[in-house]
């Protein structure tokens, strides 16, 4: 996955033998692939960032049993995603070289019904304060979800916590470019 060969973006997902770590096959998907998530039905959701010109960001679905693309979701732009049960939380930060601007969107896609449940999972207007979403995670125990904001990539970012219904519970300033979140059930020591 990745977009390191502009304009000749790679467009394949590699299937790896975990015993030998060798590529068994490649699956042709779409250009500039970025992230993958597996649902409970054996489908792999793959984000494509497009080419920032005429090919827009979208989501592809691979059936892990057949290693075939079974769905292309052009109306679901996708930079980053997280899955919890049947809900695929997706945000997109789409850059356009035509307009020299970002288009940011948020959605929840239902992996069971194959329908978009909502076009904005943040319901209290907080999304207007988030400049560049850069990470997302869902607490599997509580359903709370977290979105990070990289802001301008050179100043401290922000971590937002939202309730299941999309309302901001709290936020905290982070280091630069916050991207990843981990959950644990072990009690951690407080930083002094």
Describe the residue ranges of each PLM region.
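Predominantly soluble domains enriched in secretory-pathway, periplasmic, or organellar proteins
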Residues: 1-192
């Amino acid at each position: 996955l990745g977009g390191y060969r502009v304009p000749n973006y790679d467009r394949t997902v590699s299937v790896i033998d975990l015993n030998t770590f060798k590529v068994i096959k490649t699956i042709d998907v779409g250009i500039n692939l970025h992230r993958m998530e597996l649902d409970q039905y054996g489908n792999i959701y793959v984000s494509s960032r497009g080419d920032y010109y005429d090919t827009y960001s979208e989501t592809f679905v691979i059936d892990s049993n057949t290693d075939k693309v079974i769905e292309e979701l052009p109306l679901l732009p996708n930079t980053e995603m997280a899955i919890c049960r049947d809900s695929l939380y997706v945000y997109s930060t789409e850059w356009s070289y035509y307009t020299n601007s970002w288009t940011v969107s948020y959605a929840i896609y239902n992996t069971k019904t194959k329908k978009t449940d909502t076009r904005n999972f943040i319901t209290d207007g907080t999304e207007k304060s988030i400049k560049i979403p850069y990470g997302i995670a869902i607490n599997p125990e509580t359903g709370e979800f977290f979105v990070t904001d990289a802001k301008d990539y050179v100043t401290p970012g922000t971590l937002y916590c939202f309730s299941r219904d999309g309302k901001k519970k709290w936020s905290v300033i982070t280091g630069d470019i916050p991207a990843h979140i981990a959950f644990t059930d072990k009690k951690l020591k407080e930083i002094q």
